[in-house]
From Swiss-Prot:
It comes from Synechococcus sp. (strain CC9605). GO terms for biological process: nucleotide-excision repair; SOS response. Residues 214-249 form the UVR domain. Keywords: Cytoplasm, DNA damage, DNA excision, DNA repair, Excision nuclease, SOS response. Interacts with UvrB in an incision complex. This is UvrABC system protein C. Belongs to the UvrC family. NCBIfam families: PRK00558.1-5, uvrC. One of its GO terms (cellular component) is excinuclease repair complex.
Amino acid sequence: MDAASGAPLLTQPERLERRLKEIPAEPGCYLMRDCDDRILYVGKSKALRSRVRSYFRSRHDLSPRIRLMTRQVCEIEFIVTDSEAEALVLESNLIKNHQPHFNVLLKDDKKYPYLCITWSEAYPRIFITRRRRFRSPLDRFYGPYVDVGLLRRTLFLVKRVFPLRQRPRPMYPDRTCLNYSIGRCPGVCQEKISSVDYHRTLRKVAMVFQGRSDELQHLLQEQMERYAERMDYESAARVRDQLQGLDQLTADQKMSLPDSSVSRDVLALAFDERLAAVQLFQMRAGKLVGRLGYTADASGLEPGLILQRVIEEHYSQVDSVEVPPELLVQHALPQQKLMEDWLTEQRERRVQIHCPQRQQKADLIELVQRNAEFELLRAKQGQEKQSLATEDLAQLLELPTPPRRIEGYDISHIQGSDAVASQVVFIDGLPAKQHYRKYKIRSSSIRAGHSDDFMAMAEIMRRRFRRWARAKAEGMDVGALRHKGGSALQTDGLNDWPDVVMIDGGKGQLSAVMEALRELDLHEDLNVCSLAKQREEVFLPGESQPLESEPDQLGVVLLRRLRDEAHRFAVSFHRQQRGERMKRSRLSDIPGVGPKRVKDLLAHFHSIDAIQLASIETLSKAPGVGPALARDIHDFFHPSDEGTDADARAALEEQPQELSA
C-alpha cells in the first residue's frame, strides 16, 4: 500500500500485524516511511521480522526519539540481502542517499572539512571543501580534518613546497602568469608540464595528507642523492628545498608515539544517562594527525553500541585510503567481527579491531577517554546555557513552555534580482542544519529593478505552511499545538510544526506575514515575532510597540543568533544563484549556444572553468557539440593575439570562482 494514501500503522492494528507478518526472517534492511512517503528511518538486521516487530511490541523500552518516529510510520519496506555484512553496506548507502531524519544518532553540528584532489582531470585541482560530492570515482577526499585553520596552513605550505596549479582558471588565455615565473606553478594553463608528470607531483602531495610525511621524506632523500650522483645539481637543490619545506610541515603535528611505523584510529567515549561524547584520534605513522569529536544520544544504549554507530557513521563517509589497518576501541563492539569484515572490504586490505587492556595501547585509550570527558563536560554546559536561553525566550514571549523548535526567515536579493529566502531551524537552542530550507522567490512582481520584501516574505509563509493549512481544513486540531508544544502532537506525517517563528524585520514584515497566515487560517495557531535590526527590538503581532527587553538578555541573544544565521544562509544562497546566472549568461554570449545547450554543457563539464580549459577535441565529445561549435567555444575563451577583443578578455577575468572550492 502506498504510504501517502494511508494512516499511521499504530492506528490500524490489523494492518500493522499483516504488514509485520509479510516481513521475512532474513538479513537485510528496512525503511520506515511516513504518510507523505518520506523515509523516516533506515535500519539493518540479520533477522528483519523480529527487529522490525520490536519497534511496535514494547514501545515503553524505546527512546523518546524512536517512540516519536513509530507514531508517524505509515509503511514499512524491506530489502533482503545475502548476509548481515551486505546489509551493513546497503544501510550505509541508503542513509547517505536519503539522510532520514530519525537516523541522526550523532548530533555533532559541525561539518568537518576535507581536502579534495580531482584525480579524474588531466591537471587535477586541490582544494578544501565541506561537501563530499563525487564527480568521478577517481576523485579523492582526504580527511575529515577537525582543525580547518591547520588544514589551510598545511595546504598553503604544500603549495610553496611543490609547484602546483595555483588558480581554478587561467589568468591569461595565451601566456603564463607570475606564479610560473617564480616557480610556484608548473605552467598548467599553457601545458608547460605533461599530465603524467603533474600527476606524479600530486601523488607526493597526497602522501602528506595521508600522514605519510616520513615515507615521502625518505623517497625525496633518495631522489636527491640520485640527482647528485648524476651531477644534476639544479634538480638536487630543488628536491633539497622540498625536504626543508616538509620539515616545516611536520613540525605542526601535535604528538608522536614510540612506534612510528603504526597507523591506527583510537576511539573512546565518556557518557552519562542522557549524553555521550565520543573522541576519535587519527594516528598515522606514529603521529597524531587529526582528532574528531561527536556527541550522541546515550539514553538506553550500551557504550559499545554507541562506538559501533560512530564507526559506521565515520567510515561510511571516508575513502578507502583513510581507513587504517587497526582500530583501538575502549569497549568491545556488539558486532565486532562484522565491523572488521566491513572495514576490510572498505579498505580492500585487512583491518583489525582491538579492545586493549594493558601496556601502551591501553594508555592511549585512557588519553582519548580523558579528552572525551572534557568534551562531555563542555557539551553539558552548552546544553544548560541553551536551556536557560529558551526559558528566557518563553518568558519574553509569554509561552506556556520553553520552545523546542524555532524557525527564522530572511530574504536576500539585489534590487529584486536573484531573490531568495532562507528558513533556518534551531532545536533546543542549537542549529539543526538538516532542517534548513532554501526558497527561490517565484512572484513575477519581484524581479530585477522591482523588489518587495513584504510580498516575498508572505509568499514564503504560504509555501511553508500550506500543508498544515490543509491538515487543519481536514479536521486536525492545529490550535492545540500552540499551547501543548509542537513536538507533543506531531502526527499524520506532519512533524515540523515550529514552537516559534521569527521574521527578520520590523512591523512591516510582521504584518505581511500575519496577513499570509490569516489567508491560511493559521494566524491564531502560530507563535510569531519579528526582530528589528537597528535596536534589536522584538515585535509581536498586533502590538504597536516593541516588547520590553534588553539586547543582551539570553532570550533576545538567541533570537539574534537565529536572525544572523538566517541572514548568512540567505546571502550565501543568493550569491550561489547569482553566480550560476552569471555563468549561464556568459556561455549564452557564444554564437550557437542557447539555454538548453548551456544546461547540457554545465551538466557535462560541471563548471565553466572546465569548459574554458577543455581542448577542441574534448569539447566536441560533449552531447550536442560538433567540431564546428567546439571550435567556436574554444575560440571564444582563447581569442587569437591578432584579434583580441578587450571586452571579452575583461569579461573573462570577471567570471566568478567555482562554488565547490
